Amino acid sequence: IKFRKYGVMKFIGHLDMMRYFQKAMRRAEIDIAYSEGFSPHQIMSFAAPLGVGITSDGEYLDIEVHSTRSSSESVKALNDTMVEGVEIVSYRMLPEHAKTAMSIVAAADYKVFYKDKGNCPFTLDELKGKVKAFYEDAPEILVTKKTKKSEKVMDLKQLVYDFQVEEADGCPFFYLKVSTGSVD
């Protein structure tokens, strides 16, 4: 299932989105499979949790079903149960032993805009110069990652596949393609 998350729903966290989709599956009468055992739960997994405050046009959710309607009927049934801010874009059956969305998604595209688009502090050329000085000219961008047990120095530049400055409505914004997986 591919879905969009926008508007006020950007403030809903990942665990609440999971509970929301569990209820939406029941309301839409999707014949979803349940795990076995003492406390059965719907078999579903999100490709990558989206941070609070971030909108998306392409989030992915895998579910296991016993039977299904056509893709268009399933999209309509789910969208009829959705609140404003969540929209099902597509629904399709995968082969029996297909990899999960979580294991396939390796990168994510981000567009980072200034909060007040009408009051941009930099011109496009100024921002391009700052990005060149910070990102392109630097051989590495080191940060210290702290865990409960240790500290580890990481090079963030290895996790950024593309970093551009673009312009929309007269205001520059950042376009980034970054790794979604873990890097040791």
Predicted regions and their residues:
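A generic structural signal for short beta-strands and their flanking turns/coil linkers
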Residues: A28, P40-Q42, D57-L61, E84, ...
